[in-house]
Amino acid sequence: MDFGNETVLKATGITKKYGAAKALDKVSIEIKRGMIYGLIGENGAGKSTFMRTIMGLISIDEGSIELFGTTDLQAARRRMGQSIETPALYPELTARDNLRIQAANGGVSDREIEDLLKMMRLENTGKKKAKNFSLGMRQRLAIANALITNPEFLILDEPTNGMDPAGMAEMREIIQRLVKERGITVLLSSHLLDELSQIATHYGILHEGHLIKELSKEELAQESRQFIKIDTSATEQAVTVLDSLGYRDYFVQSSRVIQPFEGIDQVAAINQALVEAKVPVDGIHLVGQKLEDYFLQLTGGNPHV
């Protein structure tokens, strides 16, 4: 889907103070239509605070916010939906009745409600009350609530928090479908680095209220990509061995260096195969870093934040 180059959110120099402490310090973020922008940071980094300023739930002390190219934020926020922290649901009501209440003033038809339930995989919950839903079901219902007004921009704070791997995968699929099928732009946060790397197209790393780095998905992959470095005087023979092992993703950097990008946990086996084929190996070792290591390098924090 071609989303063009429209700016959905332009936050410039956002600062939020609580007494002498700065929860946000001159944070500037620009989000284009069609992006899934992921905020990464440990608890207390400022992720929720930033989202709340965009939604108008808390004021800012410095900076400016534009939504859809306008500073008329009251009108622009009608084009947004959000699910922040604990989902605000009616625990004694069913999924359908929760959505009907949300839809009461919006002219939303029962057909549209059924479509939302189906998209969120809640169509078969029947008379089951929301208080008896699993965490994943509650999160999906909260997103359905946020979609009632058919928003163009969706803000999700920790949408996979507390979920098991199956629930996380399901939530990823739903968010990606929203972007693909409805053209929705998404801002979401997480403290699970690996999880966010599987869904976002762009990233902002927050640390102690500062935006310390922005990257695209491709740039992040390059920063955290690992490979094996093989130093040999017989690159052609080494390539033949790699081919025989079934490896295809490698780069012949020079007449002496080959970089395989797969089999990174098989360094010893690759070395053994080269030696058995009488390929002279002057050096073989793993190069690069994992996503968690990259985050640690930037923040000095805990990778499992």
Where are these regions (language model features)?
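ABC-family P-loop ATPase nucleotide-binding domain
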Residues: M1-T15, G301-V305
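ABC transporter nucleotide-binding domains
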Residues: E6-L9, K16-L188, L193-H207, L211-K213
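Generic beta-strand hydrophobic packing signal
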Residues: T12-I14, V27, Y250, I284
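Residues at or immediately preceding the N-termini of alpha-helices
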Residues: L73, D110, K217, T235, ...
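Generic structural signal for individual residues within well-ordered alpha-helical segments
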Residues: R77, L99-R100, E114-L117, A169, ...
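ABC transporter nucleotide-binding domain
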Residues: R172-F261
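Short, charged/small-residue-rich alpha-helical element at the C-terminal edge
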Residues: Q226-L298, V305
